[in-house]
Regions:
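Glycine-rich oxoanion-binding loops at beta->alpha junctions
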Residues: 122-144, 169-171, 175-204
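Conserved beta-strand elements of the Class I
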Residues: 153-155, 207, 246, 339
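A glycine- and small-aliphatic-rich helix-loop capping segment at beta-alpha/alpha-beta transitions
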Residues: 164-179, 200-202, 224-232, 259-265
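Extended, charge-enriched "interface" segments that sit outside catalytic cores
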Residues: 11-16, 23-24, 28-35, 41-147, ...
Length: 550
């Protein structure tokens, strides 16, 4: 496949960008109170639906003209053409000369997507079939550990996308998980993480999934070696490794040397970035937890949103609209962050998952031509589940000096039988979005009898923008839909900003430096340090604390 052709024009030089700059000056002080007063139908008109999700974007600081100009910007920047190039399997990851085919991971059986002359969908389903067969063996008890006991505990060992996605999905879908099994996740190279995950488990009932494409990732392989020693020491046999470890990797030689039968190695491809891989073999722990049928439902949800993004006009395209609104606040209002507020305790790790997805994708300072950008790119992503966050950081959103656009995610049907609590939870979603939009004026407070000296402190200015996303119920299908919503949201932003959303060279630099420093910390003899004076001093203090020579 040829590489996708992209316009070299800088986004800030487009007609739409210049029009948006002028438009911003015109409406920057317009209040949402006025926008709603002028248009009684705004709350139903500025909405969009697709793939089972309902997006209310009416509480954004936009007019019809704003949205028209944002869509014009997307078209001038070739968002639709770049989207289509991705779905065709073209190499839109230009720095690594790779296709970007996470959409192939959930393409229905029989679909054809050609990358480098090969139908990758057939390969995807071959791995899915392998995963399903293995998952069924573990779930049924057919797969037994070294001593003949069935597996009751599964520990996923990975880092970044090999960890955040599986952990987020397991917690989100725990109501669909096998209650007889325990699932845990180890990522941090801090030994406390491994100890916490294993302290109350029996090795003869525990299966480790080692997730590393190269089987060389420092954190993952350090934890893998620790896990191997734990199993071998507990079960007094090297042969136990083959029954208590499987791998998600492409390094058959490394997997075999570790002691894992390569028949129990689940592969994936270089056209899938780690942060886009939770629905690849990286999701093996998810499939074991919820079962192959529920995993298929999750993939169907991903595909539902893929098709919505691929076929829906930008004016009603959920991920495109959300991405363009992020551009609006990031580049015209100067907002530096986006808050992600899921009102579901099961979605507590969703903000952390989106941190990697968005910040690793769009945290870039050069454009596709290699030139330093003269415009802001990816915002900081953060958040907590509601209502927890209301009692910690919402105060700053309501009355602070920072503009923080927020996404509120609400589920209409509860998973818990405690429906009264769900009513309270949902009331808080709607109340927070309303309060942020409209605030409370001094006149309103005085009419309610607020003491004069207190009134200035109690005023909430409002005009804080939010999206509200309504989901029927937190099911495997809905989770897939929501993840794909944000994947394509990120894509839209990156295409507008003219950056490569699919590489991560900044991450690589830190890995290289860490490999250099490790032997300098470990050596018995005093190392010849050649870092800057700060790093040399820090290394020296560490060595001194551990009684090593300097």
């Amino acid at each position: 496949m040829p590489e996708a052709k992209m316009t070299a024009q800088r986004p800030i030089d487009t007609a739409a960008w210049k029009a948006l700059e002028a438009h911003y000056e015109k409406i920057k002080n317009t209040h949402l109170r006025q926008l709603f007063a002028d248009d009684p139908q705004r709350g139903t008109r500025l909405t969009a639906e697709g793939a089972g999700l309902y997006l209310d974007y009416s509480k954004n600081r936009v007019t019809d003209e704003t949205m028209s100009l944002l869509v014009q910007l997307a078209r001038e920047r070739g968002v639709e053409e770049r989207r289509d190039a991705m779905f065709r399997g073209e190499k839109i990851n230009i720095t690594e000369k790779r296709a970007v085919q996470h959409v192939a991971l959930r393409a229905p059986r029989g679909t054809k997507i050609i990358v480098d002359g090969k139908d990758v969908v057939a390969d995807v389903h071959a791995v899915l079939d392998q995963m399903a067969a293995f998952s069924n063996r573990v779930r049924s008890g057919e797969w037994k550990g070294h001593t003949g006991k069935r597996i009751k505990n599964v520990i996923n060992v990975g880092i970044g996308g090999s960890y955040l996605g599986p952990e987020m999905a397991y917690i989100a879908l725990r109501d669909f998980s096998d209650p007889a099994m325990t699932f845990r996740f180890v990522a941090n190279v801090d030994g406390a993480a491994f100890t916490d995950a294993t302290h109350d488990l029996n090795a003869d009932e525990t299966l480790f999934i080692l997730s590393s494409k190269t089987f060389t990732t420092l954190e993952t392989m350090t934890n893998a070696a620790t896990a191997r020693k734990w199993v071998v020491d507990s079960l007094k046999s090297e042969a136990a490794v083959a029954k208590h470890f499987v791998a998600v990797s492409t390094n058959a030689e490394g997997v075999s040397k570790f002691g894992i039968d390569t028949a129990n190695m689940f592969g994936f491809w270089d056209w899938v970035g780690g942060r886009y891989s939770m629905d690849s073999a990286i999701g093996l722990s998810t499939m074991i937890a919820v079962g192959p049928k529920n995993y298929e439902e999750m993939l169907a949800g991903f595909h539902d949103m893929d098709e919505h993004f691929r076929t829906t006009p930008l004016e009603k395209n959920l991920p495109a609209l959300m991405g363009l609104l992020t551009v609006w606040y990031n580049n015209f209002f100067g907002a530096q962050t986006v808050g992600i507020m899921p009102y579901s305790d099961n979605m507590k790790r969703f903000p952390a998952y989106l941190q990697q997805l968005q910040m690793e994708s769009n945290g870039k300072h050069v454009d596709l031509e290699g030139n330093h950008v003269d415009w802001q790119t990816g915002p900081i992503i953060w958040g907590e589940p509601g209502t927890d966050g209301q009692h910690s950081f919402y105060q700053l959103i309501h009355q602070g000096t920072k503009l923080i656009p927020c996404d509120f995610i609400a589920f209409l049907q509860p998973l818990s039988p405690l429906t009264v609590m769900h009513d309270y939870l949902t009331a808080n979603v709607f109340a927070q979005a309303e309060a942020l939009a409209f605030g409370k004026t001094a006149d309103e407070l005085k009419a309610e009898g607020s003491p004069d000296f207190q009134t200035p402190f109690r005023v909430c200015e409002g005009n804080r923008p939010t999206n509200t996303i309504l989901v029927d119920k937190l099911t495997p299908r809905a989770l897939g839909t929501m993840v794909a919503l944000y994947e394509h949201n990120v894509f839209t932003q990156g295409a507008v900003w003219n950056i490569d959303s699919f590489d991560q060279w900044g991450v690589e630099l830190g890995k290289v430096l860490a490999k250099r420093i490790i032997p300098e910390l470990e050596s018995a003899a005093a190392p010849a340090l050649k870092h800057d004076s700060s790093t040399n001093t820090l290394i020296g203090r560490y060595r001194k604390a551990l009684g090593r020579k300097n």
